[in-house]
Amino acid sequence: TTWSAHCRQEGERLGYDMSALGDTARITEPINADIAASTQLLFEETYLATVRSLGKMLAGDGMMTKNLCLSGGTALNCPSNSRVWREGPFENVFIEPTCDDGGLAIGASLHLYHNLLDHPIAASDTPATAYLGGAYGDNELAVALAVDGIASESPDDPAEAAANDLLADKIIGWFEGKSEAGPRALGHRSILADVRSAENWRRVNQVEGREPWRPFAPF
């Protein structure tokens, strides 16, 4: 029995309104929300069991380490990562910012270069950073704003101005330095809102053009 067939059978047995199943206009109704939550929990349990099995295998071979590095699309699942960190056998869990398919390609190339072609890994004192993308100067930003007719000003303290806007329940876009590598916004190209307002969940999703139920990453 497939997972989808199992969910359908259980939904009918438990008396859910099955007419809403898969209907994007009714995506938050119980049958859809509960299947999504159950699928997430199943994924978390499978993910955690895999990590625990890895820990046991390493320990059995005398190779136990305190460190775990996760990559691939599954490592973009933040609730699962949190459980692996809290409940798994590894003390330190690292998820690199480009853990999607693009990052896997980079990792495969580095593995080939260093492990198969035997090129040494050069020592570096440069701190690792996720901010590897493009940076733009004030003139470039002014031109981009002018093209769309957007008025701008330059406050003496941008952080204070942003904090005041957030306190006034405004949604702001934060643009700073180089852009992030990988699919996640990590503070240099981010949309920010006051988390104390439940309404901001809907507002930010509306600004981003996303479905109203989509979650956010706290920062």
Language-model features: locations:
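Flexible beta->alpha loop and helix N-cap segments adjacent to enzyme active/binding sites
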Residues: 1-21, 25-26, 56, 67, ...
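Short acidic-aromatic active-site loops that bind/stabilize oxyanions
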Residues: 25, 29-45
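Phosphate/ATP-binding catalytic cores across multiple sugar-kinase/actin-like superfamilies
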Residues: 38-64
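Active-site metal-binding loops of divalent metal-dependent hydrolases
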Residues: 74
